[in-house]
């Protein structure tokens, strides 16, 4: 089963790498997806809609932008969201401790309701969105540069292979 999962990851990675478009456009789509994936909480359909609209606006690949929003998924939010809240609380000057934030998130995850979410309070929400915005920018920028480097390198190697093949064919 583990090999099957690795194979699936490899297939999707190769599809991503082989996507048509300039390295800038592909990297920009990843950056948009990462940013939106951080600042809009999961479970809200707006994450998908906003990522696709921004991708279209910036003339990038909406599919890649949508896929990149999955940086926040049910598994990663268990780590990301408390970190967002902690960093945001430090920026806005709130005294929320990481232990308190983590404890409240665990309670919320085990017994979710909209009332319990609203009862977290405005400081909690404000610290979340400030931290998410900061991390969204950082992760988006990192995602852009890493993706740009990977795609550029892949396209250079691909072009070198094509040139080498043509030279062998012509000689």
Regions found by a protein language model. Name each.
Residues 127-152:
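Transmembrane alpha-helical segments in integral membrane proteins
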Residues 154-171:
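Short, highly charged, low-complexity non-transmembrane loops/tails of multi-pass membrane proteins
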Residues 33, 37, 55, 72, ...:
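Membrane-water interface at transmembrane helix exits
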Residues 83-112:
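Juxtamembrane non-transmembrane "cap" segments at the membrane-aqueous interface
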Residues 1-23:
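Helix-loop-helix hairpins and the membrane-proximal interhelical loops
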Residues 39-53, 57-67, 72-84:
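Transmembrane helix boundary and interhelical junction motifs in multipass membrane proteins
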Residues 21-44:
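Transmembrane alpha-helical segments and their cytosolic interface motifs
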């Amino acid at each position: 089963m583990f090999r099957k999962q690795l194979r699936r990851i490899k297939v999707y990675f190769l599809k991503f790498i082989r996507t048509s478009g300039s390295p800038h456009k592909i990297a920009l789509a990843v950056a948009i997806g990462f940013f939106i994936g951080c600042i809009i909480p999961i479970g809200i359909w707006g994450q998908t809609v906003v990522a696709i609209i921004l991708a279209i606006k910036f003339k990038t690949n909406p599919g890649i932008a949508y896929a990149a929003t999955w940086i926040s998924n049910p598994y990663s939010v268990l780590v990301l969201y408390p970190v967002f809240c902690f960093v945001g609380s430090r920026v806005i000057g709130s005294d929320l401790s990481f232990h308190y934030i983590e404890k409240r998130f665990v309670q919320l995850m085990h017994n979710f309701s909209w009332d319990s979410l609203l009862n977290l309070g405005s400081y909690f929400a404000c610290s979340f969105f400030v931290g998410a915005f900061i991390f969204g920018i950082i992760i988006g920028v990192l995602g852009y540069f890493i993706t740009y480097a990977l795609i550029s390198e892949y396209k250079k190697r691909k072009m070198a292979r094509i040139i080498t093949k043509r030279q062998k064919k012509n000689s």
